[in-house]
A protein has these predicted regions:
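Metal-dependent nuclease catalytic cores that hydrolyze phosphodiester bonds in DNA/RNA
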Residues: 1-107
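An active-site-proximal "capping" alpha-helix that borders the catalytic cofactor pocket
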Residues: 10-12, 150-161
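Short loop/turn segments at secondary-structure transitions that flank enzyme active sites
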Residues: 16, 20, 123-125, 171-174
Length: 191
């Protein structure tokens, strides 16, 4: 749910909340209003109770990191789409592959200007409890290499849309854009 809330906040800041291909990009909210909107949605989640408080503990910790993650996601998206007139938000699309009996359904996170990017969020990870019972958390750095599954996903998106793929890795420590310019796995030969 936290990754969804990061995307919600970024969508609001870019005018892509409630996106539809017919309406397109709307008037954006300012970043603080976008963060408040995403946090309000986040607070609608009720942590599960059957896991000895693990989900509730993560819920509280993740809430503290969401504002920075949203801000980094917006910075990364603005960086990636610099000079692009119109950005499209997430919507359901279909791709007909002649070798398959059914169409492939895909949800591109963001696209425009002949390129597309998929948002990937990494949340803080819990450290073991200290002797006094308290816990600290480790904030990961944004990833620099995609997983095999992420490369396969981007290959399908590229084949379906013809738009050059990229990945936006976001943590509360920053963001990293991975594309064909800085990662061999994202080049045409590997996709």
């Amino acid at each position: 749910i936290s990754g969804i809330n990061v995307q919600t906040g970024a969508d609001c800041a870019l005018g892509l909340h409630n996106y539809s291909p017919i309406q397109g990009q709307q008037e954006p909210m300012d970043i603080n209003q976008s963060v408040r909107f995403a946090l309000t949605e986040y607070q609608g989640y009720t942590p599960r109770k059957w896991d000895n408080g693990k989900d509730a503990e993560e819920y509280e910790e993740f809430r503290e990191h969401l504002p920075e993650m949203i801000k980094h996601a917006v910075e990364g998206l603005k960086d990636f789409f610099d000079g692009v007139n119109r950005i499209e938000g997430e919507s359901m699309k279909y791709h007909d592959e002649p070798l398959l009996d059914v169409p492939i359904m895909l949800y591109q996170d963001y696209s425009g200007g002949g390129k597309q990017i998929d948002l990937k969020c990494s949340l803080p990870m819990r450290n073991p409890p200290k002797k006094d019972g308290t816990r600290t958390w480790r904030v990961p750095k944004p990833k620099t290499e995609p997983t095999a599954q992420q490369v396969m996903q981007q290959a399908v998106y590229w084949k379906a849309t013809g738009e050059k793929p990229a990945l936006l890795f976001v943590t509360s420590a920053g963001y990293n854009i991975v594309d064909e310019n800085n990662c061999e796995l994202m080049t045409e030969d590997n996709l």
